[in-house]
Structure formats: C-alpha cells, structure tokens
Amino acid sequence: MRRLAPLLLASVLLAAPAHAEQDLLLGADMGSAAMTKAEMTRADVEALIAKADGKPIDLSDKALAGLDLSGLNLKGANLRTARLNKANLRGADLSGANLEQAWFIKADLSGAKLVGAKMFGITARDANLSGADLSRSMPIGDFKGANMAGATLVDLKGGADIKNQSMGLMRAVFVSVNLKGANLKGANLGRSRLEYADLTDADLTNVVLMGSDLSGANLTGANVAGADFKNVDVTAARLIDLQGQDSVKDWSARVNVDRAITQVSN
C-alpha cells in the first residue's frame, strides 16, 4: 500500500490546476512538521552563536518549533528545512539567512530583519511579519494568511522561478495576506498569487505583477505608479482611489477594469 502512495500523489498533481499543485506540495508534510517538538533550547542557540564568534551558525533541519529566539543575531544562518512553527523571532536579525524549505507556520517574525534572505519553498502560513524588513529577499513560497502590515518589501524577488525546477514552478503565495501600508517598491511579484490580499495604501511603485492573480484583492489607495499589470487578473479586485494610475503603461489595454470594483457602492 505504501508503494502506491507516490503514484496516487502524482495522479492528484497531474489532475490539479497549477496553484492547487503548489498547495499540495507545500502542505504535504504540514501536519508532521507542525507537531515536531523542539530539540534545542534558546540557551543552546545562544551558545552556538557565542561559539561561532560572529560567523553564521548552522541550524539546518533542526526542530525549533515554539522556541523564543526573539532579538537574536541569526545573520547569515543556515536554517534550511528547519521547523520553526509558532516560534518567536520577533526583532531577530535573519539578514542573508538560508530559509529555504523551512517551516514558519504561525511564527512571530514581527519587526524581524530578513534583508536578502533566501526563502525558496518556505512555508509561513498565518505567520506574523508585520513591520518586518524583507528587502531584496526571495520569498518564493507559501505566506497564505500571513500578516505583513507595514512590512518593507523593497526590491523583493518573489516572481516565479523558472530556472529552479526542483519543486516545480514555484511562486510567491500571498493569498489573503495583510499587506496594508506595506512598501513593495520595485518588487518582482510576477506570476504571484495575491487573491484577496489587502494592499490598502501599499506602495506598489514600479512593482512587476505580470501574470499575477489579484482577484478579490483590495488595492484601495495604493500607489501603482510605473507598475506592470500585464495579464493580471483583477476580477472583483477593489481598484479605488489608486495613485499613479496614469503612469501605468497601457493601463486601459492591460487592466480589465470592467471586472474590478472601481468605485464605492452606495
């Protein structure tokens, strides 16, 4: 029976739509990963940091769920495939860290510094990233339901990665994410999933959204100056009081506003 499992999964993936396939891949081990208990303490991690004497530490594949790692200097750390579900990383410095295929479900990363972090295949559903700095990072993974209010995502590299095919055509998943007031200036979110995302008053200046799904998203008051909306799905999206709309190339031709909500109903 166990031998049949991979075949059954493969048949499901072949029958599923592209974004459903990604959900299956990212969620396949969610249950077991979420239940893994921490194998280290905060003191253990602090000891590793002290011993490294300023060099990046290796926490790859470690079970760190629920740990309080708030405020720690984890700059450049290797956290690849680490399990940090419900961990407290508030204010931690994860700049340049390797977070590929790591688990951060319901983790607190508010105010954390993630500049230039590698996040290919990351799972951070329902995580708190409010006020975090993800500038120049590569969050090609699953952030469904996360809180990114007030976060800085300047020069984000979240577009679909067509070069790395090890996990299929991955893309940034920001479904139902709170990006209210977030700074996404110059971010690459091509082919990303942003259904029902809250982008109220967000700065989308020069953002690449080509081929993305913004259906049901709220862009009220957002600055879209210079943004690329080519082949973007805006079905039922709220495009009210947009700023910089006149500078968007071929706005009327590229954006099907007839499918969007462009004014407040009485």
Regions found by a protein language model. Name each.
Residues 5-15:
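Bacterial N-terminal signal peptides
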Residues 19-266:
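Tandem repeat scaffolds
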